Amino acid sequence: MNIELSTTIQPTVDSIAGRLLSAQAKKQRMPSLSVECRDLNFDLAYRIQDEALSQRIERGEHVVGIKVQSRSSVTPLTGWLTDAMALRTSDHLPTELLVDPGVEPVIAFVMGRRLCGPGVTAAAALAAVDLVFAGLEVTDSRYSDRRCTAPDLVADNLSSSYYLTGPVGFAPAGLDLSREEADITVAAGTATVSRFDAVARSHPAEALAAAANCLARRGHAIEVGWTVLVGTAPVPLPVGFPVTARFSSLRSVTLAC
């Protein structure tokens, strides 16, 4: 089922945010926002993302971190994590709430100190980290077409739906995250092998620092206790099979589907 968007009236930020949340709740699809909003840019997309977060907070959710989608040589994209998205190792993924899910291995940084840009370096970012975990993130786009732009993804909170971190955290000292790899395995076999340096500008801490500087331009900081996910790229999630990501240094994490 698709949600039809008006092409004659410029939607307001709050109404677009409400439609995205409604589509998620009802498992409905909608055209990419850039189809109806020709002027959709990153500034407007982040306003929509923040308004959607405000509406989620009003219904009782709490911010617990951010997702970082790093892009080579350009400013990373960020999305919000709330407590409603966090899964425990004993939880089953609520696949009945998803339309076309994907899954990706992520490095999860748990912050020990507040990180506020501008001017944050990778070294400063890593020094602010308390523990590092293996993780999995589940994505699920609201869009019915494949023509979505980067601002479309931002408005939809980077398609982030759920995340899970492994049972064991590691102090960042002594870890060489620039060489970290992870493979995702499902019942049908291994899907992919991912190098985090391929998408995180040679070290995931570079993405963490860039995210802090990006958030500062919008008046935000990365707070103590937050989880920051730095990922690779999602692969299709075969519903009904457990998914395990095995990391080279951070051990493994399994998501029950």
Task: Show where each model-derived region lies.
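Short leucine-rich amphipathic alpha-helical surface patches
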Residues: 212-219, 232
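Catalytic-core "active-site belt" of small-molecule-metabolizing enzymes
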Residues: 8-203, 209, 217, 236-238, ...
